[in-house]
């Protein structure tokens, strides 16, 4: 009986560990979820960090705009692969009502230094707002588990789509266009 209990505990722990590893290693290949109607939740606000390329932003002040939140870190290979696409969306859709916010949640100590982040933002040609998240407050509020992770918020500030890893760019762009075409909330008309 004791052997059965111990075996059950060991198997359960192994499955939990394997699930965590799968999330970690499958993230580069991408996984997405679209939220509709009552499934969508209001996005947590962005905790205070140091803002680059912008004054501090609050999501409530962005109601009426579609918001893309990109969790990244400059040492992440997959994040660097997604940057050209994210930057092109900023150029293409910002005039139509899209706001992109980068949330820089560092993995390594040198990524925590704001001067290093500023240098990388300049080098990478990022022109949209970036907020530092050295203490992972925003990361934890959004329950992020891997870099890069992208959230799309509708004009009411609700999470309508999220994607982990690279890829699914056509679906993301389709949803950006769909959300931009939706009517803004009544209080913003």
Regions found by a protein language model. Give the residues of each.
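Short active-site neighborhood of thiol/selenol oxidoreductases, capturing the structured segment around
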Residues: 57-80, 86, 100
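Structural microenvironment flanking redox-active thiols in thiol-disulfide oxidoreductases
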Residues: 80-124, 131-140
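Proline-centered helix-kink/hinge sites
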Residues: 44, 77-78, 84-88, 129, ...
């Amino acid at each position: 009986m004791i052997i059965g209990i111990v075996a059950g505990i060991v198997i359960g722990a192994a499955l939990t560990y394997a699930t965590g590893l799968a999330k970690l290693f499958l993230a580069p290949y991408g996984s997405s979820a679209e939220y509709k109607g009552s499934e969508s939740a209001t996005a947590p606000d962005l905790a205070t960090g140091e803002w680059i390329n912008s004054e501090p932003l609050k999501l409530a002040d962005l109601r009426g705009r579609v918001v893309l939140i990109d969790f990244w870190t400059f040492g992440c290979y997959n994040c660097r692969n997604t940057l050209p696409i994210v930057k092109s969306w900023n150029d293409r859709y910002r005039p139509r009502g899209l706001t992109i916010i980068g949330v820089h949640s560092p993995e390594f100590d040198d990524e925590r230094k704001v001067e290093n982040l500023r240098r990388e933002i300049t080098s990478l040609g990022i022109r949209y707002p970036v907020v530092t998240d050295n203490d992972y407050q925003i990361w934890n509020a959004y329950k992020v588990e891997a870099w890069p992770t992208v959230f799309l918020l509708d004009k009411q500030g609700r999470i309508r789509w999220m994607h982990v890893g690279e890829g699914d760019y056509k679906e993301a762009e389709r949803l950006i266009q769909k959300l931009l075409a939706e009517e803004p909330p009544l209080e913003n008309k």
